[in-house]
Design a protein with these regions (language model features):
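Beta-rich nucleic-acid/ligand-interaction surfaces
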Residues: 262-270, 348-354
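Catalytic or ion-translocation cores adjacent to nucleophile or general acid/base/metal-coordination motifs
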Residues: 238, 247-267, 276-330, 334-337
Length: 498
């Protein structure tokens, strides 16, 4: 693709997606020329460009910039920094985006989020082409259909970028990848460019927050709510109130928070934030298995959810009642010890008990799921007693955060090649232990292999199904009360003393 044609296509795309208006065409061309370090261009008349062609158009401009020495390195980190600068030149200013969102929100909050989600893709902040590479499937289990995804949309760092990052002076701007200061930031080799990123202000429970989408989209309309201030994650009464206020304002979305302790929390504990979106997880579909009640809260329907983790579900017409009861449960859990069930509130002054909360609307009612968490470590389980155990690490050894708690496995990219190799070996009868790709999976695969007859047509489906069953085991590991008579009796002991 010729350079001038690529510029014309990019301008056509921006006009089509209403990133720029017809009156801004010349200005936009000049903004691109500046970013590309060009003195001029001659644009062809016809140059339509749809979303599916955008990656090729950007690639053509990046290849040309590298050939001319404008793009210094031709690796993914540097290419991402550069193509984000190009898209940033075509992205409306924050006030325009906020104005459009607020105007639509006054009509209907769903209209506002529909537009904002599409906009976040049109600017290439959410890279549709990379999200499409993620491998996804569902596995039926006793807990319902769990979602499994092998995440391929996060680019791997290249060695040159890692080396360059070591030589950079330390920077605390932006303070983290969630901070509002990311909006419009040019990025560097160890921090993504965000010139095409726009956030919208929201107020939840009287506090100033922002709404944005995750660039990696693990599920439909995967949004992030972030505190305006860079303050640590904190599960408390105000957190419950904010979650329920959010689903009051955006009833078509769920929202939840990662826990506020290491091991059982998410990857970012330093900046208070929630994750939500428009997706129905297996956990939401899971029924209440044991009805329970809390004195003084007869108007709140409560129960233990049929789920591999230990979840109390609360449903009520009034969100204030859920806030009161959730706070009471949290306060009780924070200080609760039951040595016979290996629940220790603290050791050596270090707290262990917390909650992963998820809020949603159930018809007109409000609902809170409270997943009880504990981050105790032991000599046998140094990464966490209620964390994936060592025999499951070949599939999942990372923290079990909010998204996994709800029933969606986010598995590492390495598994795409490894699981394919396992399937090949099961068909061919090859030695699983000799191949570096399959050695870590050998015990697991040899365990389920006798149950099946493998063919080239069915092997991958079987391996995926068994991977999903491992994820169910991973969630069972993270459950503080096991799904045994003893475990459920211990769960009820906690509930009765609340």
């Amino acid at each position: 693709m010729e350079r001038d044609q690529a510029i014309a296509k990019l301008i056509s795309y921006a006009l089509d997606k209403e990133l720029i208006q017809p009156e801004e065409k010349i200005w936009a061309v000049n903004a691109l020329l500046e970013a590309l370090e060009l003195d001029g261009c001659t644009l062809p008349e016809e140059a339509a460009c749809g979303a599916e062609e955008l990656p090729q158009v950007l690639d053509a401009l990046l290849d040309d910039a590298y050939a001319r020495g404008v793009l210094k390195e031709n690796s993914i980190v540097y290419r991402d920094l550069f193509d984000t600068k190009l898209m940033g030149a075509l992205t409306p200013r924050p006030a325009q985006v906020i104005g459009k969102f607020q105007a639509l929100r006054e009509q209907d909050p769903k209209k506002a989020t529909d537009w904002y989600y599409r906009f976040s893709q049109d600017t290439n902040y959410i890279r549709r082409d990379r999200i499409a590479k993620d491998v996804q499937w569902k596995t039926g289990t006793q807990y319902g259909e769990l979602d499994i995804t092998i995440n391929l949309s996060k680019p791997e760092k290249d060695p040159k970028a890692i080396a360059a990052a070591r030589n950079l002076p330390a920077s605390n701007y932006p303070r983290c990848q969630l901070c509002a200061e990311n909006e419009g930031y040019a990025g560097r080799v160890n921090h993504p460019a965000r010139q095409n990123h726009r956030i919208v202000p929201i107020t939840i429970n009287g506090s100033p927050w922002f709404l944005q989408y995750s660039p990696y989209v693990y599920y439909n309309e995967h949004c992030i709510c972030l505190n305006r201030e860079h303050v640590p994650m904190k599960i408390d009464r105000a957190c419950f109130a904010k979650l329920l206020d959010f689903v009051g304002q955006f009833p078509h979305y769920f929202v939840g928070s990662n826990a506020d302790l290491p091991i059982v929390g998410g990857s970012i504990l330093a900046h208070d934030h929630f994750q939500g979106g428009r997706y129905t997880f297996a956990m939401e579909k899971a029924p209440v298995e044991t009805a329970i009640s809390f004195p003084g809260y007869e108007d709140v329907r409560a129960g233990i959810v049929k789920w591999p983790m230990s979840v109390i579900r609360l449903t009520a017409a009034q969100p204030d009642r859920l806030v009161d009861l959730a706070d009471r449960i949290l306060t009780s859990w924070r200080g609760y010890t039951d040595e016979s069930a290996m629940i220790l509130a603290e050791t050596d002054g270090e707290p262990h008990n917390t909650i992963t909360p998820i809020a949603r609307r159930r018809g007109e009612d409000y609902e809170l799921d409270l997943a009880l968490r504990n981050n105790l470590t032991t000599p046998e389980h140094p990464l966490g007693l209620y964390h994936p155990h060592a025999e499951l690490h070949h599939i999942k050894k990372e923290n079990i955060g909010l998204i996994e708690v709800m029933g969606l496995a986010v598995l590492p990219a390495r598994l795409k090649a490894e699981l394919a190799a396992v399937a090949d070996k099961l068909v061919s009868g090859g030695d699983l232990r000799e191949d570096p790709l399959t050695a870590a999976h050998a015990d697991w695969a040899e365990g389920f292999a006798p149950n099946y007859t493998f063919t080239a047509d069915n092997a991958m489906d079987i391996v995926r199904k068994e991977t999903g069953l491992v994820f169910a085991q991973v969630l069972e590991c993270a459950g503080v009360y096991k799904r045994t008579p003893e475990g459920q009796a211990a769960f009820l002991r906690f509930i009765q003393q609340v």
